[in-house]
Structures are given as C-alpha cells and as structure tokens.
A protein has these predicted regions:
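Internal, well-ordered alpha/beta segment that forms a basic, Gly-enriched binding/recognition surface
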Residues: 130-223, 227
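Short hydrophobic beta-strand that contains or immediately precedes a catalytic carboxylate
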Residues: 387-389
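Short, conserved secondary-structure transition motifs
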Residues: 135-139, 245-252, 420-432
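Glycine-rich phosphate/pyrophosphate-binding loops
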Residues: 121-142, 408-419
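N-terminal catalytic cores of NTP/NDP-binding nucleotidyl/phosphoryl-transfer enzymes
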Residues: 92-124
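Short active-site loop/helix that positions an aromatic residue
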Residues: 394-405
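Aromatic-residue-lined binding/catalytic grooves and analogous aromatic/hydrophobic interfacial grooves
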Residues: 190-355, 359-364, 370-371, 375-378, ...
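N-terminal regions that are enriched for targeting/export leaders
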Residues: 2-103, 175-183
Length: 556
C-alpha cells in the first residue's frame, strides 16, 4: 500500500498561513526547514538508476535544468528585469525551487506560493521558477465582485473579455480589447464601497500593457502579475508550461513515458484505486477519473487512455488521448473522434526519434499536452529540488508519488505545501460584523422553533394568566408523559402527546410568527457575510499594504 500522506486543510483565520517546511528552522524543530528538504531531495534523486532511453536520469536532469533555466530567464527578460548569472555551471548546480498555477485571477492564498518561492530560493541561495500552467482550460472570463452589506450581498459578474469556446489558456487570445482595457475601472467602481483602494487600480494598467504586447489573455495576466512582483522585490523566473514541454530534454522524458504508455496507464489506475481505498473515497471521479480503455475497432485491439490532452489548430477543444501499440515500433495516438497520428515511439526506438516525432506534431499544429499529474512529475523529477504545492496540488500529487514508485521503484523528491487565507478587511466599514453572529442567532431561532413544536407549554403565559383550555392541555400531556409506555399503550401515548402539542400551537402562534419572520433576514445575513468574507476573492481586490503583510514582505 502506498504511503499516502495526511491531507492538509486551508487555514481559517484571515491572515493565517500554512508553510511546510518553514523558510528557516525553529528552535523546536531545527531539522525542519527548506534547506533540509533540498538536501534530502537531492539524496532521493541521486538514488534513481532509471534509464531514460540511453541516458541515466541524473544526466537528463542536468541537461533539463540547463534548458529550463536558460529558457525561463529569456522568457522573463522579454517583459521584466531578471538576474541571469554569468557562471552557468554554478547556476545549474544551485537549488531550484519551483511552483505553478493557472494564469487566472486566483485568491491571495495561491499568490502566497509565489512569495514562498522567492523566500525559499533566497534561503538556499537558489533560483525560483514559477510555471504558468497555460495548458489548463480557460473556462470563463468574468470575475464575481462582492457588492452589498453584511445584511444582504451578492456577486456581480464583471467580464474582463468576451466569452468564447473553452480552450487551453495558451490558445486563448483577447477577443474584445476594449472590454479588457476597461475591466480595472469597472471592477474597482463596484468594489469601492467595500474596498476603495484595491491593488487592481495599480495593477490592471500593467495587464493592458502586456496584452498589447503578447495578445494572449492568460499570458497577459501572468506577465502583469509577475511585473508587479518585481516591484515587490521578488526575484523569480517564470515559464509557461507550453514552452517547457517543447524543450528537447522534456520531450525525451515525455517520449519515454509514451513509449511505456501501457505501464503508465496501469500504474495510474492502480494508484487511484489505492488512494480511494486508503481514503475511503467512493466516487469514481475522485480524486481524478480512471483512465479508460476502448475497443471501438476490435481488429485494432484496445486503445488505452493516457494522461495527456490533444487538440489541433482547427479544433482547439482539449480532448482525451488514447494510445494503441498493436503495430510494432509504432505508437498510434487518437482522440477517438477525428484526430489520429502514428509516431515512431516505443521502448526500442531511440530518444532522438521520440523528440523528432513530438517536434513534428508541434510543426503540424497538433498540441499534445500533459495533464496536471504528468506536468508536476516532469517538474519534480527533472528540474526542481523542491516543488511548492498548494493544498489541492499536494493532495493530487500523492498519486504522482505512487505512480513514480510503480514506474521506477524509487521514492520521488518530497514537495513543500504553502497556502493561506486572506479575507477582505471589511470590519472597519461594518463594525456590526464583530458585534453580531448571525449563524449563532439563526441556530437559536431554529432551536426555539423546534422547542415550540415539541414543548409548546414552555412558551405559554404564566400559569395564572393561562386560559383554562391551555391548562387542561398541559395537564393531559403531563399525564400521558407520566404513563408507562406499555406495548398496548405506547402508540396511543405518542399520539396523545402529539395531539396536545398541536392544540397548544394555537396559544404560541404569535411567538412562532415572530421567529419565522427572523429566519429570512438572518439567513440572508449569514449568506452575505460568508460571501463578503470568502477566501476566494481575487488577490487584486485587496489593498496593497494588506497583501504585502500577508505575503511575508512586511512585518506587522
């Protein structure tokens, strides 16, 4: 059984952070630090004796680190300043701290990972690289702006571009430049009653500037954010995943995985099955769906799904990839719809043929892109000394760990986990938030309503002010309560008590009506408070000083 690790939980309090390991060791745990994790991971990687084609893994690692560092520096320097050491050999030998996320408007807890990349790299005199996961889907181009008060609030959906068919971020251009350019002003105006000075006002002009240069939606957002980080003093590099997977050394590793596709398929599904068993997960789609097998054409044999996506310039929908190896020395890939390509990829063919085949796909505008688990496998095995995950990624990468063990027999490098929670600072605008607790009050109202149903006598007027009928009903109920529930009387006893309760409801109508009148406003207030204080609001809705404090850039 794989050694699946415990699940992390997002911090609850605003401003709280989860950083494992810490940037620097504490007196209580001197061995728990990023420096120790780097050293341990290098020992784990040195134990890998797996051959990737005609290369040992460590040889491929050295070559990949050189390529990734070089290309990441060139990419970053295309839009902001970045440090590129003169001594390339020393640069490659230093620790590399890596992380990544989709180029969307994520919450501050995700952005904290980028701050941790910088802090970790400084602590070990290394280089931080953030992967822009532009191979993921661009699902929507609007943001929910919180509008209202703690009594009643809602999200106003504000678009930053016109809608389009779903496609990978790397393919998504900007459809309506004027809509994109005006987003900062429109969103800031709506947000003003809650947060009058969001960093959005300062940041969005950078996004508009980058959009005018790159003309790609996700890349414009990512480059603008990264440019802002430069003003914060963070010294990180960035690289889109779509660029990383085009590197020859990465193509060698991809080719090796594809050449052993059936083993990968089996390891992937076995790891998912073990994860579900260990964590008692019943849903077939959790944590990720199983890879399928199809037998659409019996004469061709089975087509087994692989953890990649495929699309073409003519049809940019990301589709699942199925592989067939019935022809010796050939790997057939298909979306089981319209795309089919045959590649000279097998355990017997050379890595140079793997690279040539994958390069030709790119030249013919066919995109073969790894899913999340394979992307982080590449980063963790070939490049990073430490990969920094958020909570969700850390949970998914337990599967990656087990897949690596099944394919290589070796333990993969360990990852770091960083997340945090920051809520909009609305207490100053609405002091009643601290003075009231609608959740507790709503629970009390529901308790009273239940008590009115089953114990109405507790809510009647004092005895000397009660009508005689009410007194009689109380007496009848008490006599039945005092009656021993024998087998013959149990049902009648229950009916009589219930009947007395129902008849007493006449005398508590006013109390019940007042309580019911409070349920709606309290529930609305609870929903409004949850919405306003959600941890999911985009980082750009927060004031700069609050963000800097949260991101470890300022004290206090």
């Amino acid at each position: 059984m794989p050694p699946f690790r415990r699940t992390h939980k997002a911090p609850e309090a605003s401003g709280s952070r989860l950083i494992e390991p810490p940037v620097r060791p504490s007196d209580d745990a001197p061995a728990d630090s990023i420096e120790t994790l780097v050293d341990n991971n290098r020992l784990l990687r040195s134990a890998f004796d797996t051959r990737i084609g005609d290369l040992r893994l460590w040889e491929l690692v050295a070559a990949t680190r050189r390529e990734v560092l070089t290309v990441a520096a060139e990419y970053t320097l295309s839009y902001r300043d970045a440090d590129r050491p003169d001594d390339i050999a020393d640069w490659i030998a230093r620790p590399i701290i890596m992380g990544g996320h989709q180029p969307e408007l994520f919450h501050p807890g995700v952005w904290l990972k980028n701050g941790a990349l910088d802090a970790y790299a400084r602590a070990v005199s290394g280089t931080a690289i953030n992967l822009v996961v532009d191979t993921d889907r661009c699902v929507h181009t609007r943001v929910g702006v919180p509008v209202g008060t703690p009594r009643e609030a809602h999200l106003e959906n504000v678009p930053f571009d016109a809608p389009a068919d779903e496609m990978a971020w790397e393919e998504r251009g900007i459809i309506d430049p004027s809509l994109f350019a005006s987003f900062g002003e429109r969103a800031s105006r709506l947000l003003a009653p809650i947060e009058p000075n969001p960093i959005l006002r300062r940041w969005w002009p950078l996004a508009v500037e980058r959009a005018g240069e790159c003309h790609r939606l996700g890349i414009a957002l990512a480059q603008a954010r990264h440019s802002l980080e430069a003003r914060f003093g963070w010294e990180t590099l960035e690289l889109p995943v779509s660029e990383m997977v085009r590197l020859p050394t990465v193509m060698v590793f991809m080719g090796w995985l594809l050449a052993h596709g059936r083993a990968l398929h089996e390891a992937y599904n076995a790891s998912i099955a073990d994860y579900r068993r260990v964590h008692k997960v019943r849903g077939r789609g959790r944590p990720v769906p199983d890879l399928a097998v199809r037998n659409d054409i019996p004469a061709e044999g089975p087509w087994f799904e692989l953890p990649w996506w495929i699309w073409s310039r003519d049809d940019r929908r990301r589709r699942r990839v199925f592989a067939n190896t019935e022809t010796p020395g050939t790997l057939a890939l298909s979306d089981m719809e319209t795309l089919r390509v045959e590649l000279p990829i097998s355990p017997e063919t050379s890595p140079s043929k793997w690279v040539d085949a994958l390069s030709r796909m790119e030249e013919h505008s066919l995109r073969l892109r790894p899913r999340a688990l394979i992307t982080t496998m590449v980063a963790r095995l070939l490049v990073a000394d430490v990969f920094v995950h958020g909570i969700g990624g850390a949970a998914y990468d337990q599967l990656t760990d087990d897949i690596v063990r099944r394919l290589t027999g070796c333990d993969p490098p360990r990852h770091a986990v960083v997340s945090g929670t920051l809520r909009l600072p609305i207490e100053g605008l609405f002091p009643e938030i601290a003075a009231t607790d609608p959740a507790a009050e709503l629970a009390r109202v529901h308790h009273l309503l239940r008590d009115l149903e089953f114990h109405p006598e507790r809510h009647l007027l004092p005895v000397d002010a009660q009508p005689q009928e009410a007194k009689d009903l109380i007496g009848q109920k008490q006599r039945w309560i005092d009656t021993h529930p024998t087998a013959t009387l149990a049902r009648r006893r229950c009916r009589e008590i219930r009947a007395a309760n129902e008849r007493m409801q006449f005398y508590t109508q006013g109390i019940r009506r007042d309580l019911l009148d409070r349920v709606g406003p309290l529930a609305a207030g609870l929903r409004a408070r949850k919405l306003l204080q959600s941890r999911e609001h985009p980082w750009c809705f927060f004031p700069e000083k609050t963000l800097k404090t949260f991101l470890l850039l300022e004290n206090g």
